[in-house]
Amino acid sequence: MKAQTALSFFLILITSLSGSQGIFPLAFFIYVPMNEQIVIGRLDEDIILPSSFERGSEVVIHWKYQDSYKVHSYYKGSDHLESQDPRYANRTSLFYNEIQNGNASLFFRRVSLLDEGIYTCYVGTAIQVITNKVVLKVGVFLTPVMKYEKRNTNSFLICSVLSVYPRPIITWKMDNTPISENNMEETGSLDSFSINSPLNITGSNSSYECTIENSLLKQTWTGRWTMKDGLHKMQSEHVSLSCQPVNDYFSPNQDFKVTWSRMKSGTFSVLAYYLSSSQNTIINESRFSWNKELINQSDFSMNLMDLNLSDSGEYLCNISSDEYTLLTIHTVHVEPSQETASHNKGLWILVPSAILAAFLLIWSVKCCRAQLEARRSRHPADGAQQERCCVPPGERCPSAPDNGEENVPLSGKV
């Protein structure tokens, strides 16, 4: 029934455009059954809806959405977009130089999820009418990420994707064994989904893997986490931390980024990063060093020189591309050197002793002044001598002679 309707529509349209009802008798028209194709597009990218026909004169092309909305119209050798639905304005065009060769494909710019659906192309020529159906499906898969977070005393791995459509398949593995994860956080909109999938790994030394799959786009992303054994170093020493990509995920022809970070107060500060696309290396820590020869061999191990006590903590190497994220974490414990420890021990003894001595001195001075003030108030005449005398409590200063003579040895008196 639909085919008959389409045929009648084009017979009327073509004959009316030719200016004569009798130029193309009905017997000369050939109806070609509808073909159906599926086209998959990505959000905000351009696509082509294919349609072809046998070459003929007086070509008429109409593209419609859901058989109702006019997407694009072409006849008499040019576009006629007066009745085009506004949502398609400035987004569609034909391959005009190829129409004469039987190409009625539609170039579609910046597709959105609202563009999903069935598109029908009606093509009429002087001798035939064809209809081609195209089913457009649109997918979204912004690059996911794997993050490591500290929440109070707990450690979490989080696999997240900011925008994805349709709803993805997320799986977790621990030491290559599938595990269940029931804490997925999902927010949806008309355009896409935003998904976070956290996993508590507190106290675990296992390796973890998260996979996010978009079945429509046939695209899979993998995040992998590995914890290395803890390292104990002395102050002023240096430490070497390994970071190498896994061959199963790494592709040398694919752009990627490497970032080394150190965690302090629950947040990571970037020590250095490397961009494969530009071979550019940025180092934010003067004691950090990379071996360029190793980098050329895809080995991103690093050295940190002249360690100090504040360097204790977690160090994270992140290798990321559009298809994977590889996280490697090291825990470094920096301990005081023996010289520093002995020095600190001496300070622990010396400082309290000095504080005690200072306290006793201050106390003695205060006591002495109090005694002098008390004696001055009882014997004002002896004030000058009392100011020069300070004795322990319970004792008195020697009394001055009553006759005013100077104190001399008894043997010196006449």
Curated annotation (Swiss-Prot):
Gene Ontology cellular component list: external side of plasma membrane
Coiled coil: none
Pfam families linked: C1-set (PF07654), V-set (PF07686)
Glycosylated residues (UniProt): 90, 103, 318
Membrane topology: Single-pass type I membrane protein
Compartments it resides in: Membrane
Gene Ontology BP term (one): regulation of cytokine production
Regulation: induction: Up-regulated in antigen-presenting cells in response to inflammation. Induced in dendritic cells in response to IFNG, poly(I:C) or heat-killed Listeria monocytogenes (at protein level).
TM region(s), chain numbering: 345-365
Domain Ig-like C1-type: 138-222
CDD domains according to UniProt: IgV_HHLA2 (cd16091)
Tissue: Expressed at high levels in colon, kidney, testis, lung and pancreas, and at lower levels in small intestine, liver and skeletal muscle. In immune cells, highly expressed in B-cells, dendritic cells and macrophages. Not detected in T-cells.
Region feature Disordered, mapped onto this chain: 383-414
Protein name, UniProt field: HERV-H LTR-associating protein 2
Gene behind the chain: HHLA2
